[in-house]
UniProtKB/Swiss-Prot annotation:
It comes from Rattus norvegicus (Rat). A motif (SH2-binding 1) lies at residues 93-96. Its main location: cytoplasm. A motif (SH2-binding 2) lies at residues 452-457. InterPro entries: AFAP, PH-like_dom_sf, PH_domain. The modification Phosphothreonine is found at T676. This is Actin filament-associated protein 1. Disulfide bonds: none annotated. Residues 271-284, 721-731 have a biased composition (Basic and acidic residues).
């Protein structure tokens, strides 16, 4: 029995150095009391009885006195505070004191007016500043004091968090490692909110006549600010110090732009705030303005501070909340100004839209738009007064792909560093944004040369096609503001960064061969280009660099006929060659088929008949395939011939009907047309506006010209012949 008592006493002493819950501590206190009672009653009786028995039998040997048992720690006589029978009042407020080894958690409890804690800024009374408010410290032994939540915490307290409409809610705020954990209750095992402190800026807003709380505003890029209320200036400084120490202990590289500055731990002076806000444009509600590392209050909050309040009564709390809700509801009814309106409805290729943006390892949907070579991210389409971030695009690099989970993702890099990670909703949207960003960054990269690792071939082809068309359109709009822009059917024309717009078409083979510059009436050569000063003005106005690859370009408006005709003639010649090759191949296949049929008749009933029949089937399949190719080729050739005739008649784009200067209205062969073009005065690469021939779209030529009376070749005739040929082969 004595051995059990000794071991039990040692066990209770060991428990004094451990973290225990309230239930275990109560059981330990009960066991300690029982042990003390047993030692005081039975222990001494057994000792006296043994001493009397020994004195009667033998002389008593010298005995060592028992060591005194140190009295273990006992709770005070007052005992733990009783648990409340009803729910805690609304103004009940607890602050957890930082723990030290071997101590139970202590909480500072204050009761405030529950009406003032409702839904406004008015809660803390003025007694606190004057030193009238008293804090009562007690040890919290009820079940709410969960030791697992505050274990290894640098600081913890019950703080008030400001909600969206100005209301306040009590949270248990704990800083562990480099994170701020907020629990709705100390009984919860999972935090309601987890905020990494790396990259955050924190501001202490002191209490004044309007603000009844000492506030800490924690702002992180891309998220709403977190506003916490503390009890005093000393507590605010303590939290600022702990947050700074927690951030300085972060492992890994730290971005100097996002690191909390030393001045963040110093309270901001009210006079300095007013001075800064008067010189700066105020930001949106809830967003702070960061200057020199110190986050200042927004303009609307400061304006509220300056306005003298008509009444300080507590009954105005509900009115203030009602006004806030009315303002928020009326935000959508306000007409945006011309600066805020996006031009997506007026542009053929909108440079704005919703994208998913990766920020702090979380995807958020943001309204993105491109303006003045900057990518501007807004929180919502309706809120264009303020922006979350503005990224200059000049000098950036566009790289598609991130991982297999997000195949429609593309990134912006500057000097190898990741600037933004964006995700589109579809392949067309991704191609459109890649084309826009390539044009705005001034990149010379072909969208087809980029690596699309996480999408299939069909989707990547769609992305590339859309990106090329968007890139071409953006560069056309940047170079020329002419309303008569050509269509985008030709796709991506110049990946070198210079747009192929209405008046710029490269010469055939990049240069004019075997042609001399035209001479004027006085024998002097005509200038082929405008003066260099005018050219520089055009280039500076367009904002596009001229490279050597497209240096030899001439004005399309004056030589539209030649440019279209040469392109169509080369295509017609290519189609005629393919048609001739198909004819020869078909003739060869028919001859082989005829020989095979004769061989099958000769070898009827022999073993070789099966092999010959298989070969005949293959030949017939190839014949059908070649026939289909020939029909499609005939149709394409007919379209090219019609387009060539329209080009010689003045071009379909401007709606002109100018006949070629040949003196005949009959259909011409490609060779004769080519000779006509060579001898015509419009075939020169003259780009002078004053000394060259009149352009084809001038009013003088339009008045003199007459509509062409020649009839185009009948397209239906070719289709009829093709059908007859198919019916003939089918029978």
């Amino acid at each position: 029995m004595e051995e059990l008592i000794v071991e039990l006493r040692l066990f209770l002493e060991l428990l004094d150095h451990e973290y225990l819950t309230s239930t275990v501590r109560e059981k330990k206190a009960v066991l300690t009391n029982i042990l003390l009672r047993m030692q005081s009653s039975k222990g001494f009786e057994v000792k006296d009885h043994a001493q009397k028995a020994e004195t009667n039998n033998l002389p008593a040997p010298p005995q060592m006195p028992l060591p005194e048992i140190p009295q273990p720690w006992l709770p005070p006589d007052s005992g733990p505070p009783p648990l409340p029978t009803s729910s805690l009042p609304e103004g009940y407020y607890e602050e957890a004191v930082p723990l030290s080894p071997g101590k139970a958690p202590e909480y500072i409890t204050s009761n405030y007016d529950s009406e003032a804690m409702g839904s406004s800024y008015e809660s803390y009374d003025e007694e606190e500043e004057d030193g009238k408010g008293k804090k009562t410290q007690h040890q919290c032994h009820h079940e709410e004091a969960s030791m697992d939540l505050v274990k290894d915490a640098k600081i913890c307290a019950f703080l008030l968090r400001k909600k969206r409409f100005g209301q306040w809610t009590k949270l248990l705020c704990v800083i562990k490692d480099t994170k701020l954990l907020c629990y709705k209750s100390s009984k919860d095992q999972q935090p309601q909110m987890e905020l990494p402190l790396q990259g955050c800026s924190i501001t202490y807003i002191p209490r004044d006549s309007k603000k009844k709380k000492h506030e800490l505003k924690i702002t992180q890029q891309g998220t709403d600010p977190l506003v916490l209320a503390v009890q005093s200036k000393e507590q605010a400084e303590q939290w600022l110090k702990v947050i700074k120490e927690a951030y300085s202990g972060c492992s890994g590289p730290v971005d100097p732009e996002c690191s909390p500055p030393p001045s963040a731990s110093v309270p901001v002076n009210k006079a300095e705030l007013e001075k800064k806000l008067s010189s700066e444009r105020p930001s949106s509600d809830g967003e702070g303005v960061v200057e020199n590392g110190v986050t200042t209050c927004n303009g609307k909050e400061q304006a509220k501070r300056k306005k003298p309040s008509k009444s300080e009564a507590k009954g105005t709390v509900s009115k203030v909340t009602g006004k806030k809700i009315t303002k928020i509801i009326g935000l959508g009814k306000k007409k945006p100004s011309t600066d805020e309106q996006t031009s997506s409805a007026e542009e053929d290729v909108p440079t704005c839209g919703y994208l998913n943006v990766l920020s702090n390892s979380r995807w958020r949907e943001r309204w993105c738009r491109v303006k003045d070579s900057k990518l501007i991210l807004h929180k919502d389409r309706a809120d264009l007064k303020t922006h979350i971030v503005s990224i200059p695009l000049r000098g950036c690099e566009v790289i598609p792909g991130l991982d297999s989970k997000h195949p429609l993702t593309f990134r912006l890099l500057r000097n190898g560093q990741e600037v933004a990670v964006l995700e589109a909703s579809s392949s067309e949207d991704m191609g459109r944004w890649i084309g826009i960003l390539l044009a705005e960054t001034g990149s010379s990269t072909d969208p087809g040369a980029l690596h699309y690792d996480y999408i299939d071939v069909e989707m990547s082809a769609n992305v590339i096609q859309t990106a090329k068309q968007t890139f071409c359109f953006m560069n056309r709009r940047a170079v020329s503001t002419s309303p008569y822009l050509g269509s985008l059917s030709n796709g991506y024309a110049h990946p070198s960064g210079t747009a192929l717009h209405y008046d710029d078409v490269p010469c055939v083979n990049g240069s004019l061969k075997n042609k001399k510059p035209p001479a004027s009436s006085n024998g002097l050569p005509v200038k082929g280009r405008a003066p260099s000063s005018q050219q520089k003005k055009v280039e500076s106005a367009g904002g596009v660099k001229r490279t050597a690859s497209n240096a030899e370009q001439y004005k399309y408006g004056k030589n539209r006929v030649e440019a279209d005709a040469k392109r169509l003639q080369s295509k017609e010649e290519e189609l005629l060659k393919r048609k001739e090759a198909l004819r020869n191949r078909l003739a060869q296949l028919r001859k082989e088929r005829k020989d095979l049929r004769a061989a099958i008749e000769v070898n009827a009933g022999r073993k070789t008949q099966v092999a010959l029949e298989d070969k005949l089937k293959r030949l017939e399949e190839e014949c059908k395939q070649r026939e289909a190719e020939r029909v499609s080729l005939e149709l394409e050739l007919t379209e090219v011939k019609e387009s060539l005739k329209k080009a010689l008649a003045g071009g379909v784009t401007l709606g002109l009907a100018i006949e070629p200067k040949s003196g005949t209205s009959s259909p011409q062969s490609p060779v004769f047309r080519h000779r006509t073009l060579e001898n015509s005065p419009i075939s020169s690469c003259d780009t002078s506006d004053a000394e060259g021939p009149l352009p084809v779209n001038s009013a003088a030529v339009l008045k003199k010209s007459q509509p062409s009376s020649s009839s185009s070749p009948c397209r239906g005739h070719v289709l009829q012949k093709a059908r007859e040929w198919e019916l003939k082969n089918g029978t």
